[in-house]
């Protein structure tokens, strides 16, 4: 009867395997390094196994800015190679060049006190290491299960590869750096210029450092010379109406505009306005204004009236008669062609006193209205040919009131500094608020609002232009 053999079962095979005779080959002769070496050789020849690829620069930038790793993991394809141990270094086949492009590697997980992290200055670049993702953790766990008892040998080999891989790294950023320092370090990885900016940001220069020398001594501060106020001692021909009136006090440093200098102006014989010519007067005419008086009086005029060296006689009591209407007519004719001309009226009384007024415009008839400006003034001429001006005080604007029956200069409070009737027979002078003048017909200085009458023996009107 033929003997039928039943198919072996898995339990039978397992039993046969357990009952196999002991092998004559001693397994103790194979070291753990040989087992790991055969495993590495298999990975090396496998077409699907590659060295740890350099991450995408764009992904690295996102990782450095602490974005979500899970979102990147979902977009990453599943690995097609068998799990292997967690890489703690760089494989010999993927060791980067000395001047490698920007790449990211992993943090060193070595806890051996005899293996400190290697810090070099290769390339003067700063390369930072991202955290592990979940794929690396799963691969590590699977590899530990497969290697089993070769864990110690793999750890030793990993330490050797770690030291080799750390030689290609530049600097490892401390993991305990504060969040703001890590953010600045991340920005510094782009270019060398960014690294310099990081040093400026993290170590700002003290504002006092720029003022110190290399010895630490402060630089001497440069003091600019302060401009001291200049004392003005010269007289000035320029003055406003207030300054002419004597009631204006100029600010400190104003060029010569002081009341003392304006009121104390004296004519010097060698002045720039020499000589002054008086024209229009006949030789037979008894003069009232002499050339010496004219030179002293010219120094008191406004600047624009000093530009000419020639004065023209418009009216003379000795030449044209005692008529106020004739005076108005002759002045009006001349003013048509000389509208900017000023007029000087000079009187000589029965005691030989000479006095008068200056108007910055022609003396014409204007019924019922005052006219003139602060440049106008009353004056007295001394026997030594000096001029004493009485300028506008600013209290009112009663400079001149000229009508058909009379003409007056200076007014206020019912008093007139100088007033003459139409025939020059009833004339008087008093202290008026407009000029605060002395009584003009008195030899000695006297102020009074009571009018003092005088007899007019001579009268002349001159044009300054």
Curated annotation (Swiss-Prot):
Source species, domain of life: Eukaryota
Transmembrane stretches, start-end: none
Chief location: mitochondrion
Protein location: Mitochondrion
Region named Disordered: 1-61, 73-119, 144-183, 202-223
Biased composition (Basic and acidic residues): 148-162
SMART domains assigned to the protein according to its UniProt record, in alphabetical order: TLDc
GO CC term, one of those recorded: mitochondrion
Keyword set includes Mitochondrion: yes
Xref: Pfam families: TLD
UniProt keyword Magnesium, yes or no: no
Function: May be involved in protection from oxidative damage.
Family from the record: Belongs to the OXR1 family.
PANTHER family, sorted: MUSTARD, ISOFORM V, NUCLEOLAR PROTEIN 7/ESTROGEN RECEPTOR COACTIVATOR-RELATED
Protein name, as recorded: Oxidation resistance protein 1
Provenance organism: Cryptococcus neoformans var. neoformans serotype D (strain JEC21 / ATCC MYA-565)
């Amino acid at each position: 009867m033929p003997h039928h053999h039943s198919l072996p079962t898995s339990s039978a095979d397992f039993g046969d395997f357990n009952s196999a005779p002991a092998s004559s080959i001693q397994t103790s002769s194979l070291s753990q390094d040989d087992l790991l070496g055969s495993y590495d050789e298999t990975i090396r020849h496998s077409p699907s196994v590659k060295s740890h690829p350099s991450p995408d620069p764009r992904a690295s930038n996102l990782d450095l800015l602490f974005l979500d790793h899970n979102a990147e993991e979902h977009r990453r394809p599943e690995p097609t190679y068998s799990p292997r141990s967690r890489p703690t270094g760089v494989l010999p086949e993927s060791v980067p060049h000395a001047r490698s492009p920007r790449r990211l590697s992993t943090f060193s997980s070595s806890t051996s006190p005899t293996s400190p992290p290697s810090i070099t200055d290769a390339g003067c670049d700063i390369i930072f290491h991202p955290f592990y993702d979940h794929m690396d953790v799963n691969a590590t766990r699977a590899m530990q299960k497969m290697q089993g008892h070769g864990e110690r040998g793999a750890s030793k080999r990993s330490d050797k590869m770690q030291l080799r891989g750390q030689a290609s790294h530049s600097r490892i950023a401390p993991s305990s750096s504060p969040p703001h320092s890590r953010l600045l370090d991340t920005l510094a990885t782009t270019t060398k210029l960014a690294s310099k900016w990081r040093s400026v940001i993290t170590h700002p220069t003290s504002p006092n450092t720029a003022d110190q020398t290399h010895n630490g001594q402060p630089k001497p501060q440069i003091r600019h010379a302060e401009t001291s106020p200049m004392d003005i001692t010269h007289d000035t021909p320029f003055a406003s109406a207030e300054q002419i009136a004597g009631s204006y006090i100029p600010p400190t440093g104003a060029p010569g505009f002081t009341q003392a200098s304006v009121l104390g102006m004296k004519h010097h014989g060698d002045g720039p306005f020499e000589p002054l010519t008086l024209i229009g007067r006949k030789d037979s005419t008894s003069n009232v204004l002499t050339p010496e008086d004219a030179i002293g009086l010219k120094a008191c005029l406004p600047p624009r009236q000093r530009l000419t060296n020639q004065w023209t006689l418009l009216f003379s009591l000795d030449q044209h008669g005692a008529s106020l209407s004739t005076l108005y007519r002759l002045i009006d004719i001349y003013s048509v062609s000389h509208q900017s001309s000023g007029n000087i009226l000079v009187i000589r009384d029965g005691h030989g006193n000479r006095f008068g007024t200056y108007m910055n415009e022609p003396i014409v008839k204007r019924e019922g209205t005052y006219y003139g400006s602060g440049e106008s003034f009353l004056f007295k001429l001394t026997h030594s040919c000096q001029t004493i001006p009485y300028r506008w005080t600013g209290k009112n604007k009663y400079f001149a009131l000229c009508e058909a029956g009379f003409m007056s200069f200076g007014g206020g409070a019912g008093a007139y500094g100088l007033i003459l009737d139409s025939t020059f027979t009833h004339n008087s002078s008093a202290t008026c608020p407009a000029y605060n003048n002395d009584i003009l017909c008195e030899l000695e200085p006297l102020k009074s609002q009571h009018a003092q009458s005088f007899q007019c023996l001579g009268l002349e009107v001159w044009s300054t232009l």
